[in-house]
């Protein structure tokens, strides 16, 4: 499978930082060409410099359908899609903040849905789509019912799209807590509480890494016999 991405074009929306950047980096190392998309031009520029000449950076906003349409028209034909980009807030039933309550679905679910819809006309029939859900689908946290439902919905979307879009392959990943860009930009006290919880409640006794999640995504891109599947790179968290 080491040559599966050789000279393939991989599109990563949310590719300037975090898991998305880790996927883009490994795709380049595997011989692929990557197009990274994000909203922040400065981060995009820096990521493209790091990735080198086999990368292209384009601005895109998954909350804007026209932005997505322009993004994919500019790219043209490509082979694989991964969309980890999302900005949301996790609140409980006691919250009256409608924007925060709906944000997981608006950003994480609908952002990926509309990205896929705009991408499909340009995506090779032998290619793949990998959606990003989360282990909260299998193991909800207190105060995170909507977030858990959103991740479950994304897993269901992946199975449904695998049927609708065949022979294009569609799979989903549901990672657990990852020691990476997202958590490192949160307050240290909250971050350490989350990491300690994960150390105590996962089978491997630690949070994951962005590199480990990227390996999972590249596996799904490269294995031509896997579709309609959901993988839990969560260190066994969902089993405890």
Where do the PLM segments sit?
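Conserved glycine-rich cofactor-binding loop
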Residues: 16-18
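Conserved glycine-rich Rossmann-like NAD(P)H-binding loop of the short-chain dehydrogenase/reductase
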Residues: 30-46
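Rossmann-fold cofactor-recognition segment
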Residues: 51-66
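Substrate-binding pocket helix/loop in short-chain dehydrogenase/reductase
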Residues: 92-93, 97-105, 194, 198
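Catalytic loop of short-chain dehydrogenase/reductase
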Residues: 101-105, 109, 113-114, 128-166, ...
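Conserved Rossmann-fold SDR core element
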Residues: 155, 164-180, 226-233
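Catalytic Tyr-x(3-8)-Lys segment
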Residues: 191-211
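C-terminal substrate-recognition "lid" of short-chain dehydrogenase/reductases
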Residues: 206-233, 238
């Amino acid at each position: 499978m080491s040559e599966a991405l050789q000279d393939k074009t991989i599109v990563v929306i949310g590719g300037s930082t975090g898991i998305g950047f880790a996927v883009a980096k490994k795709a380049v190392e595997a011989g692929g060409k990557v197009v990274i998309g994000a909203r922040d031009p400065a981060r995009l520029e820096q990521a493209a410099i790091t990735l080198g000449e086999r990368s292209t950076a384009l601005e895109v906003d998954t909350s804007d359908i026209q932005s997505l349409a322009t993004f994919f028209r500019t790219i043209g034909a490509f082979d694989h899609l991964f969309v980890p980009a999302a900005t949301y807030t996790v609140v409980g039933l006691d919250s009256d903040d409608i924007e925060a309550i709906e944000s997981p679905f608006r950003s994480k679910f609908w952002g990926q849905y509309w990205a896929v819809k705009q991408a499909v006309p340009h995506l090779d029939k032998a290619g793949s789509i990998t959606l990003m859900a989360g282990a909260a689908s299998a193991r909800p946290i207190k105060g995170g019912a909507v977030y858990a439902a959103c991740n479950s919905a994304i897993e269901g979307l992946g199975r449904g799209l695998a049927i609708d879009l065949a022979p294009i392959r569609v799979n989903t990943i549901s990672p657990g807590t990852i020691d990476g860009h997202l958590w490192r930009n949160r307050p240290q006290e909250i971050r350490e509480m989350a990491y300690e919880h994960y150390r105590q409640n996962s089978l491997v006794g630690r949070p994951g890494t962005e590199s480990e999640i990227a390996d999972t995504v590249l596996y799904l891109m490269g294995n031509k016999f896997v579709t309609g599947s959901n993988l839990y790179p969560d260190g066994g968290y969902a089993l405890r």
